[in-house]
């Protein structure tokens, strides 16, 4: 069993405060939940196991046992997970408060050691000091944490995480904040605690302490689509799809990093617990991460030969053509916005190709095809600009003075005409590289304006942010019939 989970189970019996705070789903009756093969550490009980997604943020960070309490590190409720979650700049004073909370909830003194020893020795075969029977005493106080960056905010979830070498398929990475504290002082605190333990347990305690207090902070991970619930990815192509999150809330009103101080006043803490309740929010999945995911899927279905074709149909409506017919059975086309972007982008590029290159049929092999395959991946701006520049140069532009120009004298559809008129003021006959980049951007931004999108979905917002957006009716953000811009 995980050391942190064992400690919570045993120390929960000490007093009323501990019984309220140290109650973990991992130590209660098991309830079934959706499991995946994603491996990592449950933030609630700190054990390494198979994880399921959290109902509060939809990220995989909770085990099947702890999921029954629906606790999230972004909650506004003073449960243990929230109280050991710190944000952004963590000061020495903040860490001192955390250590004091640990020492209050998991004390080690002669009275406590004798009490647990007597209980354990009531079993006939437990006269020896074996680690499996005294595992709760072997949790040192460290500044080990799992960290994650969400839209500019860095969160540190402190705890005692065993088996740091094991596989980690979550967006969290290990961070050691001992350098923000006093190393010798933390050593002294742990040596004082260790002194009350039997000699055979002291050695194990020391080994665990030094291994969890002297490690090097890992490089921070980037959160990706695979870190979120599979249910999101399966329904992402429905423009009407919304995400539902459930958050634990209360009338707790303290600075984010001061939540661990609440247990200093026990009566006030229990008053706050009485106000605990859950709130649910329906949230739009719109963000750069999920937009890029959808555009990447569409990119895999691209038939670049269309830009050399003479089809009268739109790019997604060509049938019975070996070189141009796309797979219309793909779920990505259920999002009409993807279809519109695909059709207009390829209508415009075809007009450029036909105006500047001598191509006559979609069966011809052209060098430009390779460059077109990633034209929808606009979320990586620098790479996309280089790609459009490459396409432009393959159109055999004419150089006059310092600028290069390409022709535009082939038919285009009404949507592209409107884009040209709105962006340039007319339908031009010659275009520069900047014009081509600008037009392609506007075609895509008309439906997926990544300039004004957050990187991760609103499921990673704090309760206060969600409440503010909900009051302004901005959590759903749009209906299926209008674009991101509108």
Curated annotation (Swiss-Prot):
Subcellular location: Host cytoplasm, Host cytoskeleton
Origin organism lineage: Viruses, Riboviria, Orthornavirae, Duplornaviricota, Resentoviricetes
Function: Plays a role in the inhibition of host innate immunity by inducing the degradation of key host factors required to activate interferon production such as IRF3, IRF5 or IRF7. Associates with components of cullin RING ligases (CRLs) including CUL1 or CUL3, which are essential multisubunit ubiquitination complexes, to modulate their activities. Recognizes the host NF-kappa-B regulator BTRC through the presence of a DSGXS motif in the C-terminal substrate recognition domain.
Region (RNA-binding): 1-81
Residue positions of motif pLxIS motif: 480-483
Biological-process GO terms, alphabetical: symbiont-mediated suppression of host cytoplasmic pattern recognition receptor signaling pathway via inhibition of IRF3 activity; symbiont-mediated suppression of host cytoplasmic pattern recognition receptor signaling pathway via inhibition of IRF7 activity; symbiont-mediated suppression of host NF-kappaB cascade
Identification of the protein by name: Non-structural protein 1
Any Gene Ontology CC annotation: host cytoskeleton
Entries under Pfam families matching the protein: Rota_NS53
């Amino acid at each position: 069993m995980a050391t942190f989970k064992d400690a919570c189970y045993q120390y929960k019996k000490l007093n009323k405060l501990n019984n309220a705070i140290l109650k973990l789903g991992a130590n209660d009756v098991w309830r079934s939940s959706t499991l995946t093969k994603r491996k990592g550490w449950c933030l609630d009980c700190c054990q390494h196991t198979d994880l399921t997604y959290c109902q509060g943020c939809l990220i995989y960070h909770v085990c099947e046992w702890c999921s029954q309490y629906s606790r999230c590190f972004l909650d506004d409720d003073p449960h243990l997970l929230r109280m050991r979650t710190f944000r952004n700049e963590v000061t020495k004073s903040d860490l001192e408060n955390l250590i004091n909370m640990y020492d209050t909830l998991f004390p080690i003194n002669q009275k406590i050691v004798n009490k647990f020893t007597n209980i354990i020795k009531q079993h006939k075969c437990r006269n020896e000091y074996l680690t499996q029977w005294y595992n709760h005493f072997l949790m040192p106080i460290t500044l080990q944490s799992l960290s994650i960056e969400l839209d500019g905010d860095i969160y540190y979830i402190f705890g005692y995480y065993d088996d740091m070498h094991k596989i980690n398929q979550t967006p969290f990475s290990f961070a050691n904040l001992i350098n923000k504290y006093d190393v010798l002082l933390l050593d002294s605190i742990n040596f004082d605690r260790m002194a009350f333990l039997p000699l055979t347990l002291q050695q194990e305690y020391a080994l665990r302490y030094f291994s969890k207090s002297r490690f090097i902070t890992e490089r921070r991970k980037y959160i990706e689509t695979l870190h979120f619930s599979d249910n999101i990815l399966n329904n992402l192509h429905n423009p009407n799809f919304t995400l539902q999150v459930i958050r634990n809330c209360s009338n707790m009103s303290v600075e984010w990093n001061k939540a661990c101080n609440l247990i200093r006043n026990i009566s006030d803490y229990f008053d706050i617990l009485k106000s605990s309740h859950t709130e649910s929010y329906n949230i739009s999945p719109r963000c750069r991460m999920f937009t890029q995911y959808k555009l990447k899927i569409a990119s895999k279905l691209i038939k670049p030969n269309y830009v050399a074709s003479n089809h009268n149909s739109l790019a997604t409506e060509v049938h019975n053509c070996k070189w141009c017919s796309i797979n219309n059975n793909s779920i990505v086309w259920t999002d009409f916005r993807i279809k519109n972007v695909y059709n207009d982008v390829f209508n415009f590029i075809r007009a450029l190709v036909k105006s500047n290159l001598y191509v006559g049929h979609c069966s011809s092999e052209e060098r430009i095809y390779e460059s077109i395959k990633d034209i929808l991946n606009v979320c990586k701006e620098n790479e996309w600009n280089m790609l459009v520049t490459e396409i432009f140069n393959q159109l055999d532009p004419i150089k006059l003075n310092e600028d290069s120009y390409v022709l535009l004298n082939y038919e285009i559809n009404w949507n592209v005409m409107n884009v040209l008129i709105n962006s340039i003021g007319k339908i031009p006959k010659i275009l520069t590289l900047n014009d081509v980049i600008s037009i392609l951007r506007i075609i895509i931004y008309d439906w997926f304006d990544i300039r004004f999108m957050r990187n991760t979905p609103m499921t990673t917002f704090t309760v206060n942010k969600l409440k503010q957006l909900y009051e302004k009716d901005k959590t759903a953000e749009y209906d299926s019939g209008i674009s991101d811009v509108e």
